[in-house]
Amino acid sequence: MRRSLASLVVGLAVVVALAGVAAADDGGRPLSTTLTGAEEAPGPGDPNATGQSDLTLNQGQNEVCFDISWADVDGTVFAGHIHVAPAGDPGPIVVSLFSGSFTGTDSVSGCVENVDAELIKAIRHDPSAYYVNVHSRPNFPGGAVRGQLGH
């Protein structure tokens, strides 16, 4: 009887541990979007610039990984963010992806840790309510290129 109870307890512990690992490593959800100056709001953004944003939202790890590239942005790129707002509207920053000093044709990748799991869940549930944009100085500090997620 003791052996059966001990086996049951060990078996349950293994199942719980494996469930926790599966939740923590959810494989992430990829989201990609094309970035253009025409998408910026309020516009105009950079009319000659383009870009690409590839995100992986890892809810169980509280992490957003990104690979963002852009071309022909006027000035110096200094930041990239995820904002919350529908297409055509500006919105507040919800995740700061990168900052620094980059050329008008460049790329950057990395992961942002300690992102609220509920925010990641919300983005995964309704990606079209969020957008990625890249900011440049001196002409487009509010955003040079933008792409709505889920489109």
PLM feature segments, named:
Residues 2-80, 84-151:
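Metal-centered catalytic cores of metalloenzymes
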